[in-house]
């Protein structure tokens, strides 16, 4: 059985912690990196870095030898980083980093912060230069003063030369050498200087003109330098000794050092006629001569006196010394350098002033009568203006019983704003190591590192429940010989004096500092601001005790004894629990509930008794804060159901774990509820479970709608906070903005600070705008922004584990106004790429502008000029002004159908550029009122356009808006739907009418009159209809309601009769039914079938063969039908009024005069077939003698009877009745053609009728042969079918 190793591990951990703390406390501070000098333009940011060891070392900063106040405007200090947000003249100078711990303090070398400048070119005295062809040419340039060194460029014949080429060599001095002059090199040359920090480019106002001449002689000339030069160069830097020599042929050039040839293999090398080295050494100092000669023995030379400068160095530094009290100490520091460096002595980062006990002689320091105050760190700093070097040494006193404490670094008084984060530091040394305590106006400050400072107002004390003894707790971090007092959110109650006391067994020492707290509105620190008044009042009320921070409302009782014994608990391995780890996502799918799920952090050695959860609503739209709601959850639970929340709202949650050791660090979360659902769905929601019922913490993977937040894995916890929401930007002043954000989950550790970064558009670097922003502030003011520039901002949250991810960058924000760094006018103008007339009074144009064409010179905007093309007067030009960020413009108030000239310029404070290309565009023709309006081409607005009045932007565009487009589409669709509805209604009405017709007059049904034994048909030709008084014998439809002049009988007739027009013999076609059609038309599928007028078709009943002789009256219209499934019936034949089809098989129809003829039906009818020729010669052609074909027809019918025999029956009084069923498959017809009988057989699906040509009847025979069926008076009107006249 293994023994319990828990106590052993705890004891080992505590021992190692004590040893490490002791070792760290005995280590002297030293720098691992020191700040470097920087050059920046005014208004630009500067960042200095410094780091030191051991980890207990604290870093502060000095400016020009004085302690730098971290609350200065435009200055931010965070650990070892110093950030100057906006450089101004008061912040120029040298900066030093100061590192201190319990052993002592040391100071770094100075880092100079200077402003970048670029001077102006001086006047040039020589404007025309002559160079010989095939020789060397030299263009001198007096480079203006610049910090840092300017880059030299040349503009040669209008083209820029930035780097050396094969024929052009830009020398380090800024001069230009032409290696081999030719005639092509003549022209103008201008020198320019470019500052890489300010990005300024200055060109000399008057350049030089190069003339190329023929070689005149073989003389040798040294064009540069013209006289000897003294040159001081820095050790280990590149050097070029220039020597430009001309002559034809090219002279020989060689170099001497101190009168001797330069040995080959040295650091020097030849560069054309120059002498160069990449790294010069101190041994390279001396005199260098450039010798040039030709074949004729002409020699010329020039001399350089080179002095190599060396950085300050220390060959022998300080040594640590341990002496007894009252002894004498000597420190020696051997320094070297060119020029000779000066040596400065420091004790604990403070300059040592000569005194009776402190003497400086040469490079040594002598201290007489050492006392306790002399212990600490000593420094020797060597500086010769080229560089610096320092050496440190420690002075200790022998351990002969120890000595009283000495405060090495005292706390510094500060003036801060309400709500700021304040840190007071104090370091002391002594033997044994002293214990440091803090006091305020109320006495000793007792605290625990895990607790935060809270208000001490009597109101808050009285508002607490009885028995709750909650002492004000400060956040104090103490180590051996060092202590820091932190106040996370300072208030007016914290103002006053604070005393740092260091004590050991030999005595005590004190140092004090004053803390002044001012309201934020009068704060001189301009970078940090509070939220709106509502948020400030809320924070102040919390500080007053109604809702005092996170822990003030928790039922916590902190006894002084527990606070005093806190270090012992830490020593025994017991501490307060860590912050809970929240697993819930930052959003919920329900509008009024949220499940908060977490898991416990480290319990600190004691079980967690309870969790305290506080939540409130955040109105992220206006920055309003709701009131806190506090819930206590048993320590065994890991889930809390929050109910009665507001939909679509942002909530903030703070929770801590409590054990017997106290409350741990708070965990923070922000979540958003979903949108409100419908009333029906909301009523069906399950009721909220009671608080305290444990649940399994399950996070649905389907929750993908996280509002842009990246969820961390719930199975692990990174510790760093989540990225804040995207910040919002609002205007504070002309050159400053407010950056406001909303934090999210703190990752299990409280957020200690925020950091805001900014980026100027068209640059790639993010810079720090503000850091060390207290967590109580969710807004910051960023100042000194450049007018006219566009910026983006992002926010970072910081806690004990580190920095969060960067938030999403804000939307671009453009600072109003124009930059103040315009130095010259732009040269090249924009290019108009496109013009279009969008209406009769407006023209739209687009252009492109390339900043690099003007050396990236900023512009303020564009001038757009336009005038009618037919005008030659420049005063007719009108001008529109457009912002520099625009890429298109709409010119308005133009004349219709007029051509315009359009040109542009870009401008800034320096002036206007050259004109762009000229475009000609003509406006459209003015529309006539009431004319159709054609849609105008849609104009897309560029993303960066910000319509700002005038005719710029989409507000004045003539293109249809989306609302007008929707209106047009809606109207078109409405008209289409209306047309469709009318069409459907017409189809339904027509279908209903057809159904009505088919109901009474089925197409394939032949009506059989029960009382009909025969029929009379009046046949009227179209041409003869008017011969009988313009009238017909009776009406066609209803009681003569259709006059003879009505000639359109309209109905569908497919090649034959397809329907029967209803009616009765007594005013209609058949009795018992009235006509429902006021106008009945007959349509023909083949309109050309109506030939030579119309005709009447009728069903001809088949007669017995014995009576075929009486069929002669039928002439050519005898027709034999075979009807399948027919039966004999006594019913009379049907009456069928039809229209003549197109003549087929030789059948021809002839128009007849209006006559009344009998239909040959029985043998009892007298023979009226022989008619006088003169009676019919005007109407009908003579009919040849016929012989009956009825027998053949009957035989044909009988022969086909096996297949589908037709049945015939003889009716009463000799009537032959033919009954035709609904489906007729075969019809056989026989017609006379001359003396022969032609048979035709046609297979159809409906009854087929042929024209019945009736012969004329004499007047005497007409009345005798008139037949009337029983029950019908003879004076009844006869039904007549009048055919349409064909045109």
Swiss-Prot record:
One of its GO terms (cellular component) is plasma membrane. Residues 531-553, 933-955, 1268-1287 are annotated as: Disordered. N-glycosylated. The keyword Iron does not apply. Residues 579-677, 723-821, 826-926 form the Fibronectin type-III domain. It is found in: Cell membrane. Residues 537-546 have a biased composition (Basic and acidic residues). Disulfide bonds join 50-97, 141-191, 243-290, 333-380, 426-500. This is Cell adhesion molecule-related/down-regulated by oncogenes. The lineage of its organism: Eukaryota, Metazoa, Chordata, Craniata, Vertebrata.
């Amino acid at each position: 059985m293994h023994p319990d190793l828990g106590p052993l591990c705890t004891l080992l951990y505590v021992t190692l912690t004590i040893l490490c703390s002791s070792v760290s406390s005995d280590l002297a501070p030293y720098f691992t990196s020191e700040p470097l000098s920087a050059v920046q333009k005014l208004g630009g940011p500067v960042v200095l870095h410094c780091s030191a060891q051991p980890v207990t070392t604290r870093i502060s900063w000095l400016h020009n030898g004085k302690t730098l106040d971290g609350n200065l405007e435009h200055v931010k200090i965070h650990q070892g980083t110093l950030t100057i947000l906006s450089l101004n003249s008061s912040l120029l100078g040298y900066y030093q980093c100061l590192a201190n711990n319990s052993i002592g303090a040391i100071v770094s070398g100075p880092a100079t912060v200077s402003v970048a400048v670029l001077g102006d070119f001086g006047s040039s005295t020589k404007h025309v230069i002559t160079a010989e062809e095939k020789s060397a040419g030299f263009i001198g340039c007096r480079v203006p003063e610049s910090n840092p060194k300017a880059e030299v460029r040349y503009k040669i014949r209008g083209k820029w030369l930035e780097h050396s080429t094969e024929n052009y060599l830009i020398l380090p001095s800024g001069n230009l050498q032409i290696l081999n002059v030719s005639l092509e090199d003549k022209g103008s040359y201008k020198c320019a200087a470019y500052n890489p920090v300010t990005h300024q480019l200055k060109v000399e106002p008057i350049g030089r003109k190069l003339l190329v001449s023929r070689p005149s002689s073989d003389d040798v000339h040294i064009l540069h330098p013209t006289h000897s030069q003294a040159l001081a160069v820095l050790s280990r830097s590149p050097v070029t000794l220039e020597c430009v020599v001309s002559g034809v042929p090219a002279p020989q050039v060689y170099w001497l050092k101190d009168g001797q040839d330069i040995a080959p293999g040295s650091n020097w090398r030849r560069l054309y006629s120059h002498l160069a080295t990449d790294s010069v050494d101190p041994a390279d100092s001396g005199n260098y001569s450039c010798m040039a000669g030709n074949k004729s023995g002409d020699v010329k030379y020039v001399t350089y006196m080179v002095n190599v400068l060396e950085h300050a160095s220390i060959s022998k530094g300080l040594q640590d010394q341990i002496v007894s009290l009252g002894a004498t100490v000597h420190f020696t520091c051997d320094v070297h350098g060119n020029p000779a460096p000066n040596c400065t002595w420091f004790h604990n980062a403070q300059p040592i002033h000569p005194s009776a006990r402190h003497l400086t002689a040469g490079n040594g320091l002598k201290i007489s009568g050492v006392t306790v105050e002399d212990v600490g760190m000593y420094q020797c700093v060597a500086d010769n203006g080229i560089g610096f070097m320092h050496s440190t040494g420690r002075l200790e006193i022998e351990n002969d019983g120890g000595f009283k404490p000495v405060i090495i670094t005292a706390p510094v008084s500060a003036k801060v704003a309400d709500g700021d984060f304040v840190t007071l530091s104090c370091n002391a040394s002594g033997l044994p190591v002293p214990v440091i305590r803090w006091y305020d106006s109320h006495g000793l400050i007792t605290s625990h590192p895990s607790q935060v400072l809270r208000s001490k107002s009597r109101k808050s004390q009285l508002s607490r429940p009885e028995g709750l003894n909650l002492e004000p707790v400060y956040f104090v971090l103490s180590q051996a010989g060092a202590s820091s007092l932190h106040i996370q959110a300072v208030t007016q109650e914290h103002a006053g004096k604070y005393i740092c006391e260091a004590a050991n067994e030999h005595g005590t020492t004190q140092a004090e500092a004053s803390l002044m707290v001012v309201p934020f509105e009068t704060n001189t620190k301009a970078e940090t601001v509070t939220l709106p008044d509502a948020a400030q009042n809320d924070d102040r009320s919390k500080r007053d005790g109604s809702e005092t921070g996170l822990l003030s409302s928790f039922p916590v009782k902190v006894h002084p004894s527990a606070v005093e014994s806190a270090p012992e608990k830490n020593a025994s391995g017991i501490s307060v629990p860590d912050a809970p780890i929240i697993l819930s996502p930052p959003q919920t799918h329900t509008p009024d509930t949220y499940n908060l799920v977490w898991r416990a952090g480290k319990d600190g050695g004691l079980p967690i008794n309870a969790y305290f959860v506080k939540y409130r609503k955040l109105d992220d739209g206006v920055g309003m804060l709701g009131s806190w709601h506090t819930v206590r959850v048993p320590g065994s639970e890991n889930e809390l159901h929050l109910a009665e929340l507001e939909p679509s709202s942002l909530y903030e949650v703070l929770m801590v774990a409590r054990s017997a050791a106290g409350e741990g660090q708070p965990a923070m979360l922000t979540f958003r509820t979903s949108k409100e659902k419908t009333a029906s769905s909301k009523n069906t929601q399950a009721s909220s479970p009671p608080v305290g019922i444990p649940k399994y913490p399950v996070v649905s993977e389907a929750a993908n709608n996280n509002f842009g937040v990246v969820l961390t894995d719930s199975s692990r916890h990174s510790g760093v906070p989540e990225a804040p929401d995207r910040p919002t930007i609002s205007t504070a002043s002309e050159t400053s903005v407010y950056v406001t954000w909303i934090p999210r989950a703190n990752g299990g550790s409280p957020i200690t600070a925020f950091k805001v970064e900014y980026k100027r558009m068209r640059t790639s670097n993010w810079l720090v705008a503000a850091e060390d922003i207290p967590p109580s502030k969710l807004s910051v003011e960023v100042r000194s922004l450049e007018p006219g520039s566009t910026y983006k901002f992002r926010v970072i949250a910081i806690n004990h584990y580190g920095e969060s991810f960067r938030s999403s960058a804000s939307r671009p924000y453009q600072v109003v106004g124009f930059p103040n760094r315009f130095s010259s006018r732009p040269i090249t103008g924009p290019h108009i790429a496109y013009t279009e007339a969008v209406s009769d009074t407006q023209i739209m144009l687009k252009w492109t502008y390339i900043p690099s064409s003007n050396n990236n010179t900023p512009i303020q905007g564009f001038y757009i000029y336009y005038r009618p093309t037919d005008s030659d007067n420049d005063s007719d030009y009108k001008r529109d002004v457009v912002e520099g960020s625009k890429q298109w413009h709409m010119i308005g108030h133009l004349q219709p159908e007029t051509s315009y000239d359009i040109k542009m310029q870009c401008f800034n404070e320096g002036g206007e550029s050259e004109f762009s290309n000229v475009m000609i565009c003509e406006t459209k023709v003015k529309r006539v009122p009431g004319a159709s309006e054609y849609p105008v081409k849609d104009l897309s607005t560029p993303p960066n356009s910000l319509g700002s009045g005038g005719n710029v932007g989409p507000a004045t565009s003539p293109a249809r808006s989306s609302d007008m487009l929707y209106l047009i589409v809606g109207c078109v669709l409405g008209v289409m739907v209306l047309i469709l509805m009318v069409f459907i209604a017409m189809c339904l009405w027509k279908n209903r009418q057809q159904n009505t017709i088919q109901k009474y007059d089925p197409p394939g049904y032949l009506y059989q009159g029960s009382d009909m034994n025969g029929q009379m048909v009046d046949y009227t030709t179209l041409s003869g209809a008017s011969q009988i008084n313009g009238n017909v014998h009776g009406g066609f439809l209803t009681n003569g309601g259709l006059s003879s002049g009505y000639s359109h009988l309209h109905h569908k007739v497919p090649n034959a009769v397809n329907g029967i027009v209803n009616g009765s013999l007594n005013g209609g076609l058949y009795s018992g039914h009235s006509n429902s059609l006021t106008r009945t038309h007959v349509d023909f599928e083949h309109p050309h079938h109506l030939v030579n007028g119309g005709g009447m078709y009728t069903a001809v009943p088949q007669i017995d063969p014995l009576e075929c002789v009486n069929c002669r009256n039928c002439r050519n219209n005898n027709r034999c039908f075979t009807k399948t499934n027919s039966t004999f019936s006594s019913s009379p034949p049907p009456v069928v009024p039809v229209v003549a089809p197109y003549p087929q098989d030789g059948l021809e129809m002839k128009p007849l005069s209006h006559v009344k003829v009998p239909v040959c039906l029985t043998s009892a009818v007298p023979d009226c077939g022989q008619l006088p020729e003169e009676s019919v010669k005007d109407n009908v052609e003579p009919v040849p003698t016929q012989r009956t074909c009825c027998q053949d027809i009957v035989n044909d019918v009988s022969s086909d009877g096996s297949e589908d025999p037709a049945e015939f029956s003889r009716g009463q009084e000799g009537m032959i009745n033919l009954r035709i069923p609904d489906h007729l498959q075969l019809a056989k017809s026989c017609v006379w053609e001359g003396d022969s009988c032609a048979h035709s057989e046609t297979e159809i699906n409906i009854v087929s009728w042929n024209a019945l040509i009736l012969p004329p009847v004499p007047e005497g025979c007409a009345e005798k042969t008139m037949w009337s069926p029983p029950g019908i008076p003879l004076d009844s009107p006869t039904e007549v079918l009048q055919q349409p006249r064909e045109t």
